[in-house]
């Protein structure tokens, strides 16, 4: 079994899509190990998005991610959980996401694209450590 971090971003929470997103993961055979609705502050986001801190969109990203609560979760599956989750999420830009993916079905704009999922096993471990250090 391996795990990955998923964040249902503020737009997913505001639009009432968290239950649908969780159901999709469960219907795919994945399990929720931990979940917490939390407000994300700039300090936590700077650690989580360390690779984006110097990019021009970083300020807008922090403003969006901290505007209202997000559902932060650890999802577990038999293998390649991060890859399964990312496939289910769809492309970063909802307009480029296939129907049947979370972003393809519910996404509206690239800057508010509903979900974050770790992009590798290493990223999953690092990100889980940020939000759920007791699970590492």
Describe each model-derived feature in a short phrase:
Residues 1-136:
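Non-catalytic terminal and connector segments of soluble metabolic enzymes
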């Amino acid at each position: 079994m391996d795990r990955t971090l998923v964040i249902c971003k503020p737009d997913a929470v505001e639009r009432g899509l968290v239950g649908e997103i969780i159901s999709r993961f469960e219907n795919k055979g994945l399990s929720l190990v931990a979940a917490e609705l939390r407000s994300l502050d700039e300090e936590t986001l700077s650690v989580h998005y360390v690779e984006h801190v110097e990019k021009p969109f970083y300020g807008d990203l922090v403003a969006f991610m901290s505007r209202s609560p997000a559902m932060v979760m650890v999802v577990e599956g038999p293998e390649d959980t991060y890859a399964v989750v990312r496939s289910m999420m769809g492309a970063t830009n909802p307009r480029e996401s296939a129907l049947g993916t979370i972003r393809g079905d519910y996404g509206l704009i690239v800057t508010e694209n509903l979900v974050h999922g770790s992009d590798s096993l290493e990223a999953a471990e690092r990100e889980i450590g940020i939000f759920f250090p007791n699970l590492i």
